[in-house]
Amino acid sequence: MTLSWTKRLGGGQADCVWTDPPYGVSYEGKTKDKLTIQNDSGVDFQEVVADAFLQIVRCSKPGTPVYVAHADTARTFFQEAFEAAGCMFRENLVWVKNTIVLGHSDYQWKHEPILYGFTPGGAGRLGRGGAHWYGDNKQATVFEFDKPSRNAEHPTMKPVGLIEAMISNSCQPGGIVFDPFGGSGSTLIAAYDLKMRAVLCELDPRYGDVICRRFQEHTGIIPRCDGKEHDFTTE
């Protein structure tokens, strides 16, 4: 991974980061297509995520709020890699789903953690009671949102409402939300709904198409590719 994919942000412009990187669990979708995610196992996963945290620091303003969805089984790695990049870990938030995810664990998973913290720098207190906080005083660590049923497009799609609930506390309209693992495009749609701007990166062309198609279906705006409009809903 190089800086080439972050050129659109220039030097330190992101106001908020919300991202859903590979979890390192070799996840396979439950649909007939058995969708997978690149770099979702072993050393590849660790190197990609660790480098992404460094790029997040490069592309963000000092003290930028960062949200990182991850697997509970990989929590130690995510926090250590986050702090190794110079970021400050604040706390873990929890997304509680409306249904369990069947797997091989003794207790079936019904939640996912989201790491919350800040990029290096920033003056004074960061978060509630200080800089980069636009929510009220009643925000809790638990967020209850239904798991998206349309997983035929992406195996780990996140609900738009979940992302909106978090970034609305950390970014103002017109601000830039950065997602280096674009995935299904939920971050882009959430930012659009809140009148924010978004910059996404996605390695897999298949999911790049999903991002553009979901955005077009949600907004009616036809994306542009190489300077020309491209209708992704007809593919």
Q: PLM features: what roles do these ranges have?
A:
Residues 1-208:
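Core catalytic lobe of class I
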Residues 1-8, 212-235:
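S-adenosyl-L-methionine
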